[in-house]
């Protein structure tokens, strides 16, 4: 069984647990996801099965789109709704739509983030959440990420209340912490904040409406039609530029030979996919 399963990950499960369950339901040995979702986040989780695990790295670096909710008035240990409140301040004035949109504009483009303590980023050989669980806060290296689009989804012109929540949509680069983005939004509006809800609606070319649930997988596995749920490897790579090579060159590529770049590929940037007339493809950088 080779291909990519687009799973609509439910809340309450780790991405690792989702892969393990798919492996068990479909009876496959090789499986891996293409980008971790936190347990309290649902949505698009592509899982590569069989030979498709070889292309996982070509799917992990794609842009991601999320829809979520920011809540102003309280900050938490985890930067989301699962953490303990560490700072609180009632929202003591109306928040105007134009003010939120101005903050969104200021956070669009390349920005610098500090990973949250409750994350899997490694510092000194240990994951940050291991320090956090031991009550230790360590200095974290910042990272540069790109926010391609940041849109306010609520239609209200004014937001009132001791706590204020509003929904947003963001398209961002790999490695972006959306919970940290929620905290940054709060800081620029002058209040402690956290991310109170999040769903991934797209991962690269894959959309939420194309995903299946565990119930779908179980039903198809039971009647022996689970293959129909998989996206073939060739289709999973359709977002990459395609270049045809002849069988002689293809064999050299297959064997890892170092080749002179053909003239028509000299201006190639980023990743691409080479294929031979028989249809076999090799993703490459």
Curated annotation (Swiss-Prot):
It comes from the Bacteria. HAMAP family: TruB_bact (MF_01080). Keywords: Isomerase, tRNA processing. The active site is at 38 (nucleophile). It is an enzyme of class 5 (isomerase). One of its GO terms (molecular function) is tRNA pseudouridine(55) synthase activity. GO terms for biological process: mRNA pseudouridine synthesis; tRNA pseudouridine synthesis. The lineage of its organism: Bacteria, Bacillati, Bacillota, Bacilli, Bacillales. Responsible for synthesis of pseudouridine from uracil-55 in the psi GC loop of transfer RNAs. Gene3D superfamilies: Pseudouridine synthase. InterPro entries: PsdUridine_synth_cat_dom_sf, PsdUridine_synth_N, tRNA_psdUridine_synth_TruB, TruB_C. Belongs to the pseudouridine synthase TruB family. Type 1 subfamily. Transmembrane segments: none annotated. Pfam families: TruB_C_2, TruB_N. It catalyses: uridine(55) in tRNA = pseudouridine(55) in tRNA. This is tRNA pseudouridine synthase B. Its EC number is 5.4.99.25. The gene is truB.
């Amino acid at each position: 069984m080779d291909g990519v399963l687009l799973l609509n990950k439910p809340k309450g499960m780790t991405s690792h647990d989702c892969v393990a369950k798919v492996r068990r339901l479909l009876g496959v040995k090789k499986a891996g996801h293409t980008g971790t979702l936190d347990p309290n986040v649902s949505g698009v989780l592509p899982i590569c099965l069989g030979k498709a695990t070889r292309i996982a790295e070509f799917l992990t670096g794609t842009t991601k789109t999320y829809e979520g909710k920011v809540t102003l008035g309280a900050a938490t240990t985890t930067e989301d709704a699962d953490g303990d409140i560490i700072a609180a301040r009632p929202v003591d004035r109306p928040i105007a739509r134009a003010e939120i949109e101005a903050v969104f504009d200021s956070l669009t483009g390349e920005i610098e983030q500090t990973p949250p303590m409750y994350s899997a980023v490694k510092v000194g050989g240990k994951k940050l959440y291991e320090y956090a669980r031991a009550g230790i806060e360590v200095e974290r290296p910042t990272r540069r990420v790109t926010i391609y689009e940041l849109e306010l989804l609520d239609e209200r012109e004014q937001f009132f209340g001791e706590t204020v929540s509003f929904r947003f949509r963001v398209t961002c680069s790999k490695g972006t912490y959306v919970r940290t983005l929620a905290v940054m939004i709060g800081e620029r509006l002058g209040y402690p904040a956290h991310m109170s809800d999040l769903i991934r609606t797209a991962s690269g070319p894959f959309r939420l409406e194309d995903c299946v649930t565990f119930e779908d997988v179980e039903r198809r596995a039971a009647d022996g039609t689970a293959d129909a749920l998989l996206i073939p490897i060739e289709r999973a790579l359709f977002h990459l530029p395609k270049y045809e090579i002849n069988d002689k060159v293809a064999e050299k590529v297959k064997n890892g030979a170092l080749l002179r770049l053909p003239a028509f590929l000299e201006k190639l940037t980023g990743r691409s996919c080479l294929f031979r007339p028989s249809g076999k493809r090799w993703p490459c950088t």
